[in-house]
Amino acid sequence: MRIEEDLKLGFKDVLIRPKRSTLKSRSDVELERQFTFKHSGQTWSGVPIIAANMDTVGTFEMASALASFDILTAVHKHYSVEDWNAFTSTASEDVLRHVMVSTGTSDADFEKTKQILAQSPALNFVCIDVANGYSEHFVQFVSKAREAWPTKTICAGNVVTGEMCEELVLSGADIVKVGIGPGSVCTTRVKTGVGYPQLSAVIECADAAHGLGGMIVSDGGCTMPGDVAKAFGGGADFVMLGGMLAGHEESGGKIVEENGEKFMLFYGMSSESAMTRHVGGVAQYRAAEGKTVKLPLRGPVEYTARDILGGLRSACTYVGASRLKELTKRTTFIRVQEQENRVFNSL
């Protein structure tokens, strides 16, 4: 047993220090980035935000809506091959280039993903997703996927420490997914005692991945546009959002009605709700590590997307970053004990 004494930080523990700026308007900020990925060799340009691969967020409808903002969607793994065929036959190539195909690590997952990728050459992203990215089996699957799809850009996770981030990059991941337990409907930290504050995880993993030519996506922990800015400021190349994009018309959650008001269900992918829906219930040997919440309906996702992008542009103007790419270099974090004046929050 050992204890690490240095303090680890989440998004709520810091603010970004403002700096002198020559920017005259938020409209001067360029959010689009261009990446060339280490292993696939593919070049992609767009806004590096990703809708999470949850079945109440990462839907075909969400992908179609967010593509117009140049935002990616990691489409959840529970669509059938037939569902994918219907989608790829009608979606434009521009939409498909903003889509990640999500997969687990079983042999059946591998075969299914192979069939999906064969449907369109525009499907260039694969998201290999497990809750615990520290297993040898997972690393071996990433290597297998890289060998099978040498020209596809592979995103793999989740991990939170530098050494495992390096392992995944060396095994074939172009992008490492960072985050254990920070999600709004994730209960891993309270069920297991395992986790890592998200901002510190991002800073550590970005340093590790960038040293090898890899990239990271910060997955989880963002509750407001300012958190997205902090994730980019901490070194994330991409930011994945779940709860912030849930509850919309495109989110795919079940709608329930209580006292005349409509709500949409949103749940973690290790929750009892998710396991009951997809595998028939919680296995006897495990515990659910997610919760289910009811969100008031939030309308079309376009308004939320504009709010997030607007907040990000504003953050860049406060530190003098004319491009999102510059935000990390322009960021100085200050530790704080409060984020906002909450006097009217209960109204």
From Swiss-Prot:
Active site: 186 (thioimidate intermediate)
PROSITE patterns per UniProt: IMP_DH_GMP_RED (PS00487)
Reactions accelerated catalytically: IMP + NH4(+) + NADP(+) = GMP + NADPH + 2 H(+)
GO annotations of cellular component type: cytosol; GMP reductase complex
Entry's EC annotation: 1.7.1.7
UniProt GO molecular function: GMP reductase activity; metal ion binding
UniProt function note: Catalyzes the irreversible NADPH-dependent deamination of GMP to IMP. It functions in the conversion of nucleobase, nucleoside and nucleotide derivatives of G to A nucleotides, and in maintaining the intracellular balance of A and G nucleotides.
Assembly mode: Homotetramer.
Name the record gives this protein: GMP reductase
Organism: Citrobacter koseri (strain ATCC BAA-895 / CDC 4225-83 / SGSC4696)
